[in-house]
Amino acid sequence: TVRGTYSSCRVDQEEYIRWYDREDHAHFDVCADDHCQRYQGISKAYTPAVREALEATRGEVLTYEGTICDARFSKCCGGATERFDNTWEPVVHPYLDKITDAPEDLETGDLRDEQTARKWILSFPPAFCHTTDRQILSQVLNDYDQETQHFFRWQVSYPAEQLSELVYRKIGIDFGTIRDIQPIERGVSGRLIRVKITGDKKTLVIGKELIIRKAFSESHLYSSAFIVEKQDGIFTFHGAGWGHGVGLCQIGAAVMGARGYNYKAILQHYFKGCELIKMYE
């Protein structure tokens, strides 16, 4: 059973910080949206390959210091994974920290620094998840997600009027015409934790990553690892990765598998210090 928390707070009417867990589906452990892990149901996920993998690993559990791991995952980390506590409640899981998604450590610098994050987001490092191999992607993405051509690095633009209306509709806060979007705090992967939105009616800092992604997209922005450029009344978001970036990178893991890494090596790559143990037959 998945148990979680929900938090929403305002600080002197200057901040709106929220993270999500189970409040939107109290009668179910998971839902089929970015809110959870986009669980698509047993009818879509339970293929012969999945059955084979389940049987081969029956009774195996990923643990950290004797405790079962909270083994989070996202579609594409963009080359670097994020800390759990930067995304959800302020709980530190040592195995859910930053790693670079490559055979050898990538030199990223401190991605909490704005100029370093900008350089990283605009680059195309040789990460496992930097792939366009359709066969590999078909193992991870369902049919409609495969229509997405650019997810390792991506771009989306909005006129100021359209963006202002979108933000109001998606999070219910009327900024008026949005004049500026400023990064306030980034996590270790470069993902934004807090963003300051300045409009002609209101200025407010919002967070965490999911509310940021929700605010700037009809569904969810690919990730909160982005920079914003404004020119001639157009806001352009340049971003990295797809999803919250915590834990296992699904596309990176698929590439690792295609290159001959076994599942134990893949888990050790994404969940540092964890151990697979056999709990039952």
Describe these PLM feature segments.
Residues 1-281:
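Conserved, single-site charged/polar hotspot
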